[in-house]
Amino acid sequence: AELQMELETKEINYRQSSNLQGVIMENISQEYAARLHGNQLNPYSQCITRENNSTIWTIKTLNEEAYENIIMPLSECTDIFLRKKGLSISVCNKRMHLKNDNELITEFYEKKCPKYLEIKFQTPTAFKSDGKYVIYPDLGLIYASLMRKYSAVSEAFDMFDEETLGALVEQSEIVRYR
């Protein structure tokens, strides 16, 4: 599931992601927040972007439990409060998009894919490897993260496999990075 909230502000950008993480935690149950803090892999992601001169906060969840515990409470918000900045921000528009497991699996396995993919990261991205953060693109870390997330939400498939990961990395290359 995906929730996009148009925020009535020009004052925040991707650097406030940790503050928005706090907004999520303040709007979900304490019990679920505690469970999330114990997870190695979060069942959601969030980012802030600028689109057509608007500030958009996007929250995506990977399973029904995260949808019910994160997106549903946030979809009720008419404003958010950034505690560290002491800033109250109105939510002026919301859009929700839902896909069920079958739609995702069909899209993943049946949709034709071009030979070359262009991936654009909308916010700074880092991966943890050997206890350190890696800020440069590393195909092994990108693929492993995607495989783990897919496995975490799929009851039918365990996607993570060292042999498959090795083959993906071997058959891929980063041709441009900026």
Stretches with model-predicted labels:
Residues 1-178:
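RNA-interacting cores
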